[in-house]
């Protein structure tokens, strides 16, 4: 009872004198605006490292990254002409090297296999089952050419799809003495018509072209004007 009475008396004194018997706590410091306390900084660092369970960091919506290393080049034929792809779809040789229609992308699409794309038009060079060269808006199996370095350091481009049935001789890309494209089955690898010298303009990265089906009737290259 005495202890209870003394406790009641002590409580009454605390009510009458609130600051009398309580220890004075240190006054809380208020951080000025624009600054963060050490605890706040640590909390922000901790939250920045927290990953939600089952979640992944957001990635920007990007297209597929280029993975193929090729070159932008001019193809100079030993006959004295630069290979040129014209806007009307025709392919021919020209003695002038200033035209942007002589710029081609050489994109690797297999082991020693490339596709030859017009850097200006975006069309692919193709050879059909008759050995005729034409320009295709889509990448097909007829747009694949085997690349081979000849003994004189010129490069040969042979159709990766077609060749002579009996002898197995390759069909080559070639220009005649007038700069006109030749049928692949009439071009011999030992002749100047098939010898091309790539003149590097720049190295570039490319996306792998999407393969389309070969059309039932592959168009041939229209005659050059």
Curated annotation (Swiss-Prot):
The gene is FGF11. One of its GO terms (cellular component) is nucleus. This is Fibroblast growth factor 11. It comes from Homo sapiens. Pfam families: FGF. Belongs to the heparin-binding growth factors family. Residues 1-28 are annotated as: Disordered. Nervous system. GO terms for molecular function: growth factor activity; sodium channel regulator activity.
